[in-house]
């Protein structure tokens, strides 16, 4: 299914006013939630149970394949842990991104990162709503703030960077982060992943 911006705004009002005629006047992070309906030959309308989200994004928003990964649990490499094949990265604003669903290999999570003008990746201490960043409900760690908790995965110049692909658009996000469990099996969980943008 394909559409243009004009299709999305046709007949749509927001607070009684039409949306801008050009998408450049929208804010990064603005979105539509599309609900699909089909009409039978008898005229019955049936709605699909699933929806699709269309958002105003930036270059690095999109669907990524996981092309490399490494996970260490309390100093022990865990190559047996399955990672997802793909991850969704959403734009929050011009420099902030949200990874939907996964924190490394673990689902039912989300986290935020930022890309600066030098294509370096950092992880803000707080989410856009002001809550502390967590992974699996534990404090998030990163190379800048918790280097001693990330000794088995790359930090420094070899990680937390963007590799731009100006020819094919298959940009890569090279990321190192983790979380620290305080109670129970306490200790660092360390993640390294390389995500490559999927281009149609």
Language model features with spans:
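Solvent-exposed residues in well-ordered beta-strands and their adjoining turns
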Residues: 4, 39-41, 180
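Short, exposed coil/turn segments at beta-strand boundaries within extracellular/luminal domains
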Residues: 41-48, 186-188
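Signal that preferentially marks extracellular ectodomain short beta-strand elements
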Residues: 1-28
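Short beta-strand elements
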Residues: 44-61
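Short structured motifs
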Residues: 20-21, 47-49, 158
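Ser/Thr/Gly/Pro-rich, low-complexity flexible regions
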Residues: 56-200
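A broad, low-specificity signal marking well-ordered, structured residues that form hydrophobic/aromatic
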Residues: 36, 50, 97
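Internal, hydrophobic beta-strand segments that form the core of beta-sheet-rich folds
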Residues: 25-44
């Amino acid at each position: 299914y394909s559409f243009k911006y004009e299709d999305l705004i046709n007949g749509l009002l927001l607070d009684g006013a039409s949306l801008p005629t050009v998408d450049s006047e929208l804010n990064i992070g603005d979105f539509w939630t599309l609900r699909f309906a089909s009409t039978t030959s008898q005229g019955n309308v049936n709605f699909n149970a699933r929806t699709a989200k269309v958002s105003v994004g930036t270059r690095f928003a999109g669907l990524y394949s996981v092309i490399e990964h490494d996970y260490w649990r309390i100093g022990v490499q865990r190559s047996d842990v399955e990672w997802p094949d793909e991850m969704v990265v959403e734009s929050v604003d011009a420099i902030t991104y949200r990874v939907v669903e996964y924190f490394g290999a673990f689902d039912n999570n989300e986290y935020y990162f930022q890309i600066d003008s030098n294509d370096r990746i950092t992880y803000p201490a707080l989410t856009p709503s002001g809550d502390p960043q967590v992974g699996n409900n534990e404090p998030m760690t990163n190379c800048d703030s918790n280097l001693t908790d990330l000794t088995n995965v790359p930090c420094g110049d070899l990680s937390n960077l963007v590799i731009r692909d100006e020819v094919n658009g298959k940009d890569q996000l090279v990321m190192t982060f983790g979380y620290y469990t305080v109670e129970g099996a306490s200790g660092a969980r360390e993640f390294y992943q390389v995500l490559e943008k999927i281009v149609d």
